[in-house]
Amino acid sequence: MSNVDISNDGFIGLDYDSRNYLQPQSWPVAVDHQASHRAEGARDISPLQTSGHAFEQSVAQDPNLMVDWQFQHMQPHLQYSHEEASSAPQFTTASYGMPIHSSPIDLISGTPQGPLSGSLLDGPYLPLSAPVDMVPFPYQDLQSDLMAFPSDGLAHGLPEIPSYAAPQNVIDSSSPADTYLEVRSLTSSSSDNGWSTIEPRRSHEYFPDQGFFINPTQTLHDRSLSESSYSTSYGSFVEISNPVNSPSSDTNFDAAFNNTMTRRVSFDHTSHGSQSPTAVSPVAIVRPIPVPMKKPSSPTRSTGSSSSTSPPTRKPSRKSPIAAKTAETKVRKQSQNGKPETEKRVGKRKGPLKPDQRKQASEIRKLRACLRCKFLKKTCDKGEPCAGCQPSHARLWQVPCTRIDIKEIGYFMKDWKADYERHISLGFSVGNIKGFSEHERTLFITHGYGQILPINAREVYVHNDQCFNVDWVETYNRGPTKYEVETAKLSAGMEGISHAMLSDYLDRHIDGNGTFEKFVDDYFEGTPFLTQMLKTAFRFYYRTKMPVIRKALKLIVAYNLTLHITLVEGLGEEDGLLGKVDVEGSKFKGKTLAPVMINFQIKCAMANMWRELQKDVLEELSSLYSSVYSGEKLKNWPTIFILASILLAVWEEMQFDCHYRTRDPAAVEKFCNDMETTPVGVIVGLFQAISQKLPAFTEWETQKHHHLLHSNPDVCSAMTEVRQHVTQYESYLRSRSSSKFNPKDFDCLSNKFVSRLVVRAN
């Protein structure tokens, strides 16, 4: 290399002839320093190759730029210091079109390293900025001196330095060569504006004709990359061949590497005017689209950036995006066509609908299919009734052809207020009330069945005080007898009737020890069959704790207490509250009736309560009936029977109260017809349809038929009780379907609908 004329500024003259230049050889630098904490937590530098650009660039004189490289064997027992990178001036861009960043020499960490061990000798390395005359190896003798190193890597033509016995950690560095290694390990997800390099051929016997020589250390520039590998994590650093290195570039490795690492260093010189395989234009590189794997959330990474044990190698070329999409489409089609052949298909249609069929389907969607076609998954039509519900086709199907869902069959109750509006009079109008007292007192309200409802009451001032009388009718062991008592001028407080307290009041009628059975005995006064059925339903709930059965029991309590008078408990003898019953023959003798306004307010709150409960019960019935035709068959049959029995018992009482309290015969007739035609027919007809495979109630035997109801002991016990009730009142039940209203008989309409449910099931 003595024939190479290097000027004082580190550049080679333009008259340099590469044919007289020796073959470029690589020189090794050993890495054998104890690990220390990184001086810099992140690095974002990488070499920018300028080969292939035929432009001049003038570089300002750098006082810290070495004319001759200085090298020394790095002994493990010596320490050395770094040069401050901030003191280095920046390159200028006199004639080059892009900004040129600082010199790699200036990027060397300036943080001094502490002594590696207390027992090691003191002897720092020569600083990089030392005078030129102190360098023992000038740049001209670099070629010959490096050739003297022993080489055992003859297979690849690169010298190697044997590792030391004791494992050593790698020291941090800010050399651009380390970032250059990561640039070479970038995946296809890198920016299209970056440079990609290709491994040079190992044989350098014949170099292309070169016009002039450029020092590679002066063509390294900073690059700002957004790749995720340029973060504070150094897990992607591995042993890599052919990096551009310098004597102080082996200190930027993480301390996690505890073993000695050998580095191979080589320079690849390329002229500006030659066609070199080491540089590839980024425009010609097309970034492949990774094929989506089973886990699309995890990005595809190259082995060079994701693995810390294997050297970074370029993956073979992937398939084109078109091929990837085609393969993905094929897999999707196979997954769609891979259905089991034994899967049950709903319907028989194999192709698209015809125009007339499409029009018919659109009309049916607007009208909704009838219950039969909905449950049996048949094609419905616009007929009234539809073709499927005709007598010649329905056979055992006795459900009315209706398009109303079960949860909506309570439509007949719209605007029905006969359960509480009887006590509404002009006395409750706003014009009759002058005001309310600010003082409130607590009254303990009851219906006479052992439970108490506390309510805040206040005095009300009215113009006409002749509207506070309460009348009721009793039929206990005799004909109907009417009573009337004047009550106190009190109303509920500012908060009114609490919905939560009222619900808890109803719950205590069910949860108390024997309270529900006592309520049934006292209120229904021995109504045949209905009394026994309600007690059986309560015992079934007590054993199963089914919430829907509880709602049904709460429904019948709430409805009957809505039409019941209210009493006041806990009054002393000195409390002169009006409303005490002194009439002989009344079962309420000696008790005090609640003020009429509070009685009405409780009725309104109770009426809203049982209407909500009935809505919930109808929704449960709708889902239970649907489950029968969805594959569960008779699993929910006992629950359906209990719910239907209680619901029909409430509707029977509603018919009687409508006759008894409504003075308009036409309105009463319409209400009863609306109830019996569709709602009662749907409940009874559907129960008949799902009971075809079960024996009659009078023929039920647990030992013989228990398997039909999944051998449930609670269900079998309830069925045994129902069989006893039906057997006891069979003749009575068969005569109840034709019963008529009688104002003197409160049980005249009892079991009218329940008998249809039981007898038709037989």
Swiss-Prot record:
Where does this protein reside within or beyond the cell? Nucleus
Q: What is the effect of changing residue 373 to A?
A: Decreases conidia production and increases kojic acid production
Q: Keyword NAD: yes or no? A: no
Task: Provide the residue ranges listed under DNA-binding region in this record.
Answer: 370-401
Which top-level group of life is the source organism from? Eukaryota
Q: What is the effect of changing residue 370 to A?
A: Decreases conidia production and increases kojic acid production
Q: Where is this region: Disordered?
A: 267-361
The record's disulfide annotation reads none
Signal peptide annotation: none
**Swiss-Prot/TrEMBL keywords:** DNA-binding, Metal-binding, Nucleus, Transcription, Transcription regulation, Zinc
Q: Please identify the protein, giving its name as recorded.
A: Transcription factor kpeA
Origin organism is: Aspergillus oryzae (strain ATCC 42149 / RIB 40)
Gene name per UniProt: kpeA
